[in-house]
Amino acid sequence: SSAGRSSQRSCSKDNAIPNEATAQLLCEDLPALERLAAAWQSQLRHEYAPAEPDLTITVTPNEKTACAVLTEESAERVLCMLLCVPNGIQAMSGSLPGLVQTSLNLGILTTGDDAVELHFGVRSSVASQKEMLTERLTVLTHQLGGTVEVFGDYPAWEYRAESPLRELMCEVYR
């Protein structure tokens, strides 16, 4: 059956890991969509248990008969972006075991009248790694016909093996 995506929304902060998302789908076969959602929920609960035991996928029928939807080409570009974009931990610190050095997350995804916007929080304690990760996002976005705007840039805060401030803070903390 054919289906179209009319809108989607994730969390409201680009530097937070989303805990929910919604999507409006135009669907000709509601029972098939409900079966698919139930199957995905079962699989994802199995894969993410015990971290996400309450993971839920809900299908709620909407009686809206007319709405704007993404073209097939646009939907394919969005899907390609979501499947190919880096997400999560990209590198761990070589200086401090267990410390994330470079990471990013897709915090906000919205569909407007003429654009799909994805907002990422890109972080790294190494400036060059953060720049490289931002460049990866830029290249992928441009290859898919999109544009990139960088804002809210947090500077890298590199680990220093010799840090008088850290030594003082450790003394004060004790």
Language-model segments: residues:
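Short secondary-structure junctions
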Residues: S2-R5, Y48-P53, L99-Q101, L144-T147, ...
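An extended, acidic, His-containing surface patch that forms the Zn2+-binding/catalytic region
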Residues: P31, T58-L104, T110-D113, A127-M132, ...
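Intrinsically disordered, low-complexity segments enriched in serine/proline and basic residues
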Residues: A3-S12, T22, L26-A32, L36, ...
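C-terminal, non-catalytic macromolecule-binding modules
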Residues: H119-G145
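A common structural junction motif
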Residues: A38-A49, V139-G146
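Solvent-exposed loop and beta-edge segments used for protein-protein assembly and interaction
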Residues: I17-N19, A51, G98, G112-D114
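Glycine/acidic-rich beta-strand-loop module
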Residues: Q8-S12, P18, L104-I108, D113
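Short, hydrophobic beta-strand segments
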Residues: N19-L26, T60-E63, V116-R123, V150-G152
